[in-house]
Amino acid sequence: MDINERISQYRQDIKSDRVDMSFGEIINMYKEHEIVISPEYQRAFRWDKQRQTDFIESILLGIPFPSIFVATNDDGTWELIDGLQRVSTVLSFFGELKDDPVKNNLVLHSGNIVPELDGISIDSIPLDLKLTIKRTPCRVEIIQKDSHFEMRYELFKRLNTGGEGLTRQEIRNCIFRGFQNYRYFNDIISNCANNPDFREIVNISDEAQEKMMYEELFLRFFSLHAFRGYYTEKVIQDFFDKIMKQQCETPNKAIIDSTVNKFNQICSYLRPMGYEIFKLARLNLSTSMFDSIFLSLSTSTKDFSQIDCETFKSRVQALREDPEFKRNAGAASSNASAINKKLIIARRILLEDEAE
């Protein structure tokens, strides 16, 4: 297939339309559940009060802002797929973000251009300015329901990555919820991410936690432990996408159960060693260390719990200092070849007498 045929094929897979609507119309559609913001997407509303104030100020001053994107569901409703920060800001200011009471009822800060906005709420704003916000047009790009799912996913991913966008795990959390077994597999991920032992050995910031890093780390282990032989993608995040999509469509419950059991056993074993177990150079949490330790233990043919804590910690330190391991833990260390090389080294050092 040549380049023109390829482009023509994919252009046919996505069907779109556009319309200009006022924010008042968008607010009313949201109240009537005609525009839907999924809970998985809404949780990523993270603009602070100043950013929200800046956007309201921009509307009042007539400063242009980007379009929002919606996808048409089978029942005709629209699902917001880009523009969460802007739409949620307007909903919050008008007191309509009722599913998120902590972030609802925005009170503005001082604007960069209009400092008099400080302390203004929907109850105190002059009527003419309130109507200015409600009547301001917003370009809505509509992805029709007969667009191919893969293209809807690709669009969502591209629109929501970078800047104030979502992490890849947050995107997975949103986009795959339409699959029949999404709730089953996502509950597995959530339960493992909240394993108390896991939380003790993986120490991440509140911001990283909010961006679902615990969930992604479990998905990382699950994918590499159970399906490492199917890792052919150039980018490891695409591999995680593939595995999560497969398990949300047709979960392999036997593999899921055995992998979850392994995960829980490893977390319990590592807990006394603390979160520094995954440290490498300046990184408090190195994915090279995470992969090497978890995968070495999960693929061990012997009872790793018989290795006492201090012995294992000393072996981990030896792994950190191993020149060959450090070479493979550098750039491009998440490609399939590098992961396999690191695992061979890790098993030799951590398990001593076991080979890959």
Locations of regions flagged by a protein language model:
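Basic- and aromatic-enriched surface patches that contact anionic nucleotides/nucleic acids
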Residues: I3-D20, G24-E25, S38-Q237, E310-Q317, ...
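Amphipathic alpha-helical interaction surfaces
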Residues: E96, L224-R228, Q246-E249, Y269, ...
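Eukaryote-specific, cytoplasm-facing alpha-helical/coiled-coil scaffolding segments in long proteins
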Residues: R183-Y184, I243-P251, A318-K326
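Conserved phosphate/pyrophosphate-binding and hydrolysis machinery centered on Walker-type P-loop NTPases
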Residues: E207-K211, K253, L283-S286, A336
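Small-residue-rich helix-loop
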Residues: K234-R282, M289
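C-terminal hydrophobic structural anchor segments
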Residues: G274-E324
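Eukaryote-biased recognition of C-terminal alpha-helical segments
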Residues: Q317-E356
